[in-house]
C-alpha cells in the first residue's frame, strides 16, 4: 500500500500497479495497450483495500510504539561493549525492526544460541544481494555489505512487546556480554 499526497508519486504508482499504463488510458480502447513503463498487476481486491484502510487507522499508534521500543533498546543496550546501533533520527525514520550489530559474526552466532536457550527469538540480518543466487557471478567483494549482514541481528520487535519484556531481553543480552 502506498499513501501519498504527491501527484507524481501517485501517478507513477498507479501506472506501475496497472501493467505500466498511464492513468486514464484504459478508458480509451485504442490506447489500452499503450504502456509508458514496465508495470505489474498489483491491483487490490475490495477486501484487501478494506484491510489496508483498517490498518492505516492503527498506523500512528504503531509508529509511536516502534519509536518508543527503539529508544528503550538503545537506552538499555547502548553501554554494552560489543553492540552497535545504527544512528537513527526518529523524526524521519520509524525502525520497524530493532537491529543491532556485533563486533563479529562469531559473536552473533553465540548470542543467537544463548538467547534461543532463554526462549528469546532473533533473526539474522538480510543477506547482501551479491550473495543471492541470481547475483553471485561477480568478482566484487562488497566488504561493507558483507560486514553488515554477517554482524547484524534483529531483536524482538513486535508491537505487542511490553517494556517489561524488553527489559528482560536486554538483561539477557547484558548477561551474555559479561
Residue ranges and their predicted role:
Residues 1-2:
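Glycine-rich phosphate-binding loop of ATP-grasp-fold ATP-dependent ligases
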Residues 5-178:
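PLP-dependent aminotransferase class I/II
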Amino acid at each position: 500500500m502506498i499513501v501519498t499526497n504527491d501527484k507524481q508519486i501517485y501517478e507513477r504508482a498507479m501506472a506501475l500497479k496497472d501493467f505500466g499504463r498511464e492513468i486514464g488510458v484504459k478508458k480509451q480502447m485504442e490506447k489500452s495497450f499503450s504502456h509508458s513503463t514496465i508495470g505489474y498487476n498489483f491491483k487490490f481486491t475490495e477486501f484487501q483495500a478494506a484491510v489496508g484502510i483498517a490498518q492505516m487507522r492503527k498506523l500512528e499508534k504503531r509508529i509511536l510504539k516502534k519509536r518508543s521500543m527503539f529508544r528503550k533498546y538503545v537506552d538499555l543496550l547502548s553501554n554494552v561493549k560489543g553492540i552497535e546501533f545504527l544512528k537513527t533520527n526518529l523524526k524521519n525514520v520509524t525502525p520497524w525492526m530493532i537491529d543491532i550489530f556485533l563486533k563479529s559474526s562469531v559473536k552473533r552466532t553465540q548470542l543467537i544460541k544463548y538467547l534461543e536457550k532463554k526462549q528469546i527469538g532473533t533473526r539474522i540480518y538480510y543477506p547482501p544481494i551479491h550473495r543471492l543466487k541470481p547475483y553471485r557471478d561477480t568478482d566484487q567483494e562488497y566488504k561493507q555489505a558483507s560486514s553488515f549482514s554477517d554482524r547484524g541481528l534483529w531483536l524482538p520487535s513486535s508491537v505487542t512487546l511490553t517494556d517489561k519484556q524488553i527489559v528482560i531481553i536486554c538483561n539477557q543480552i547484558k548477561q551474555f556480554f559479561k
